[in-house]
Each structure stands twice: as structure tokens, then as C-alpha cells.
């Protein structure tokens, strides 16, 4: 395969370069000189295009073998070849320079534009090769980390499963530890005394409650030291471990029970404390963060539970109280305007008499003067303007005074059953004088 082949500058000789040019059937560029040309150029082709001429100039350039070699290295690096590096290309450049100097061949042609194109193309491919090398290093680093993580996980699973063939199985571990410390009781856990004095001990347990992994000591300075088992060891009985395990399980059960209680209905003591605070601060029932922490400490609840309780209390306790208090207060309703009938305060004869009477004035004592001007063409509809409270009161007083005075002066008018229209104006004037 191409990815496994080793490339060198020798694989791009002038014979292959000439073969490429011959296969393309292009003629030599007059601006570039071929070092191996014998001075005989092929006959010019009339159908040659500028693109073909540019291709021929590139293939005839002295730096073309180096460009082709770099391009092949980039392809191999893209395919994942491990032998392609930027350092190897530096060696290839040195070999190319030595070979060109040894053969006496030039590095450039007589066309500066083509020379500049070749140099920039080599630079671009070199940068591309460096970037591919960085990507390859990152991939290798990721693969190594991933493999190490898998190995660690597999070792831990093998250690916990206690397979007979694994290096951490009880049989294998007993043989290793017996070779170091003699005999080892399978009922206990072996811990070196020096490890307990220096720092924490990292141990791994397997089925049966026995530790078979070598002891790793973590010093107070953070250094990890692995120590071999020594004869002076401390044996911890399985009964003590079982007791410790039972205590841990009981603590876990208690925590689970307390968490379940908190998730359900809150304790009555907690609700009483929060309810009392709510009614004490009913004007502004929004506790601060410090107050929430204090309430949570008193009620043995979390801040989230306290916050949720106050949110629900403001909506379910305070809001119904406010709604009920607002419903008890009497609501003032605007009285609709009523169309009072024309003959509510006076008979038909009085209304017809007022319509034909001359203008008159009504005056009340104590400065409250009500002036009523009644033109001759006043109709019944215009009397509706007198239906206000002040005008109605004045008309009632005038009528009552006129009726009392009329009864004392002349009793013959009562027999007619109605007041004469001609006496209305005089009655109104006399009553107004008497009121003054």
C-alpha cells in the first residue's frame, strides 16, 4: 500500500519527470531549461493551450520532485501512516539539496513566476504536513488515554468479580502475599502498620470481605506510595467490618426515611413556625434569604421547601383572606338616572297653569335662592329640568305654603277641586314674599 511505503527523493528521478511530460504530449517551455535535455526539442504542436504550457513548466521545474515527495507524504499522513513526520521531510530536503549540488543542477529556472509558484506550493504543503502531524499526535493521545481508562475499568471489574484466572483473584493474591509474609488468614484483612501511621490507606475489597490488592499509601503531602506487606501487620476481624457495615446501612436507611418524610407532608411543627411568621409579617409576607435560612434551621427543612411553602401560603392563605374582606365591604353602586313623571309633585291643572303663566321667581331664605323663569310657551317637557333635588324642594315648600295660606283666606277654591291657572302667578309671588 502507499501508506506503508517509504518515500525518498530518489523515487522522483529525471527519467520519471520526463516520462510524465512525454505522456502529456506537451512541449518544453522556452523560459525553463531542462538539465537533461540534449538540445533537441520536440516539434511544436500547434494545438497547444496555455494550460498545457503551464503544466509543462511545472513538470519541468527542478523543484518538482521535492514538491511531489511532499505531496505524497501529506497523503500518507492523511491515511494514518506513522512514519510520516515533519522531521523526516527536513531530512529529505537536505538530501535533495546535496544531490542537486553534487549533480550540478540548478534549483530554479529562468521564469521567476514559476519559481515563486513552486516555492509557495512547497511551503503550503509543508504547513499542511505540520497540521496533519499535530492531528495525528492528538489522536494518539486520545487513544492512549481511552485505552488506559478501559484497562483501569476492566481491572477494577475483574478485582470486584474475583475471577479465578485474574491476577487479582483470591487464589493468586494469596499466593503472592504468602510469598512475602508467609501465611495469610483468609478471614482477616491485612494492613501494614507503617501505612496506618503515615497516612490514609487505599484498599479494594472483593467477595468475602478480604483485601488482596497491595496497599497504596497517600501521604499528607499528597504523594502516593505503594508499600509491600511487612510482618508487622494489624489484622482487622470481619466481625468489626460487619458491624461497621451495619452501622453505615442503618445511617443510610435513616437518611432515606428522613428524605421521604421531607418530600411528603411537612411536619406540623414546621408549618406552625412558618405560619406564625407569615401572620406576624402579613403586611409584607416575603422573607429575606437570612430569614429563610433561620426558618429552615428552626424547622429542619431545606431552603427550597421553605420557599415553596411561602409561595403556596401567599396564594392559598392570604389571598382568600383578602378576597373575603373585600366582599364584606359594601360596594357603592351608581344610581341610574330615573325619568320622573311630570305629574309626580303637582296635578294636571297646576302643570297646565304653569305653562301659561308669566315668568316668576322663587326665592328662599338663608341665601339659598332658586330662580325659575317660566316663559309663556313653556311646555310639559321643560318641567323635567326642575326635577333636581333643590328645585323639587323649593317647589314643594311653595306649594305647601300656598295651600295653607289659600285655605285660611278663601275656602271656596277647595270646592272646585283644582287651582285656577290665573291665581298661580300671584300665589307664587305672595309665597315668595312671605318666605323672605
UniProtKB/Swiss-Prot annotation:
User: Which residues fall under the DNA-binding region feature?
Assistant: 259-321
* Ranges where the record places region Disordered: 23-50, 401-436
The biased composition feature labelled Acidic residues covers 404-416
Where does it localize? Answer: Nucleus
Q: Which residues form a coiled coil?
A: none
Single GO term (MF): DNA binding
Pfam families linked: Homeobox_KN (PF05920), Meis_PKNOX_N (PF16493)
Which stretches make up the MEIS N-terminal domain?
80-163
Which superkingdom?
Eukaryota
Instruction: Give the keywords, sorted.
Output: Activator, DNA-binding, Homeobox, Nucleus, Phosphoprotein, Transcription, Transcription regulation
Residue numbers bearing the Phosphoserine modification: 33, 41
Instruction: Output the GO biological process annotations, alphabetical, semicolon-separated.
Output: angiogenesis; camera-type eye development; erythrocyte differentiation; hemopoiesis; positive regulation of DNA-templated transcription; positive regulation of transcription by RNA polymerase II; regulation of transcription by RNA polymerase II; T cell differentiation
Write down any Gene Ontology CC term: nucleoplasm
Its family remark reads:
Belongs to the TALE/MEIS homeobox family.
Query: How is this protein organized at the quaternary level?
Result: Interacts with MN1.
In UniProt terms, what function does this protein have? Answer: Activates transcription in the presence of PBX1A and HOXA1. (Microbial infection) In complex with PBX1, binds to the 5'-TGATTGAC-3' consensus sequence in the U5 region of Moloney murine leukemia virus and promotes viral transcription.
- Protein name, as recorded: Homeobox protein PKNOX1
Please report the organism this UniProt entry assigns to the protein.
Answer: Mus musculus (Mouse)
Q: Which gene encodes it?
A: Pknox1
Amino acid at each position: 500500500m502507499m501508506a506503508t511505503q517509504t518515500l525518498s527523493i530518489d523515487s522522483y528521478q529525471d527519467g520519471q519527470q520526463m516520462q510524465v511530460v512525454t505522456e502529456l504530449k506537451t512541449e518544453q517551455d522556452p523560459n525553463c531549461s531542462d538539465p537533461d535535455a540534449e538540445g533537441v526539442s520536440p516539434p511544436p504542436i500547434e494545438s497547444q493551450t496555455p494550460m498545457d504550457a503551464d503544466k509543462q513548466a511545472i513538470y519541468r521545474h527542478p523543484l518538482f520532485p521535492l514538491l511531489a515527495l511532499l505531496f505524497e507524504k501529506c497523503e500518507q499522513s492523511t491515511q494514518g501512516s506513522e512514519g510520516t513526520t515533519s522531521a523526516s521531510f527536513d531530512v529529505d530536503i537536505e538530501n535533495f539539496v546535496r544531490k542537486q549540488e553534487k549533480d550540478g543542477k540548478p534549483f530554479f529556472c529562468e521564469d521567476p513566476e514559476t519559481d515563486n509558484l513552486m516555492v509557495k506550493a512547497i511551503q503550503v504543503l509543508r504547513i499542511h504536513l505540520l497540521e496533519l502531524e499535530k492531528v495525528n499526535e492528538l489522536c494518539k493521545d486520545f487513544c492512549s488515554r481511552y485505552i488506559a481508562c478501559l484497562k483501569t475499568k476492566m481491572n477494577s471489574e475483574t478485582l470486584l468479580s474475583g475471577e479465578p484466572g485474574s491476577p487479582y483473584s483470591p487464589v493468586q493474591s494469596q499466593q503472592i502475599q504468602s510469598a512475602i509474609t508467609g501465611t495469610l488468614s483468609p478471614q482477616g484483612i491485612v494492613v501494614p502498620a507503617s501505612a496506618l501511621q503515615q497516612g490514609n490507606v487505599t484498599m479494594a475489597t472483593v467477595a468475602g470481605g478480604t483485601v488482596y490488592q497491595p496497599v497504596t499509601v497517600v501521604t499528607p503531602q499528597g504523594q502516593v506510595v505503594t508499600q509491600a506487606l511487612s510482618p508487622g501487620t494489624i489484622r482487622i476481624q470481619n466481625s468489626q467490618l460487619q458491624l461497621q457495615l451495619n452501622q453505615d446501612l442503618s445511617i443510610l436507611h435513616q437518611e432515606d426515611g428522613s428524605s421521604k418524610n421531607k418530600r411528603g407532608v411537612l411536619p406540623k411543627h414546621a408549618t406552625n413556625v412558618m405560619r406564625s411568621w407569615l401572620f406576624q409579617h402579613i403586611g409584607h409576607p416575603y422573607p429575606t434569604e437570612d430569614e429563610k435560612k433561620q426558618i429552615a434551621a428552626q424547622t429542619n427543612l431545606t431552603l427550597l421547601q421553605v420557599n415553596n411553602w411561602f409561595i403556596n401560603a401567599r396564594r392559598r392563605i392570604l389571598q382568600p383572606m383578602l378576597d373575603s374582606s373585600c366582599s364584606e365591604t359594601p360596594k357603592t353602586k351608581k344610581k341610574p338616572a330615573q325619568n320622573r313623571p311630570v305629574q309626580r309633585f303637582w296635578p294636571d291643572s297646576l302643570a297646565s297653569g304653569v305653562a301659561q303663566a308669566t315668568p316668576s321667581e322663587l326665592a328662599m331664605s338663608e341665601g339659598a335662592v332658586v330662580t325659575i323663569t317660566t316663559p309663556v310657551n313653556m311646555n310639559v317637557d321643560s318641567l323635567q329640568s326642575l326635577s333636581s333635588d333643590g328645585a323639587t324642594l323649593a317647589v314643594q315648600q311653595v306649594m305647601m305654603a300656598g295651600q295653607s295660606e289659600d285655605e285660611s283666606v278663601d275656602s271656596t277654591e277647595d270646592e272646585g277641586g283644582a287651582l285656577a291657572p290665573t291665581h298661580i302667578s300671584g300665589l307664587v309671588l305672595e309665597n315668595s314674599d312671605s318666605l323672605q
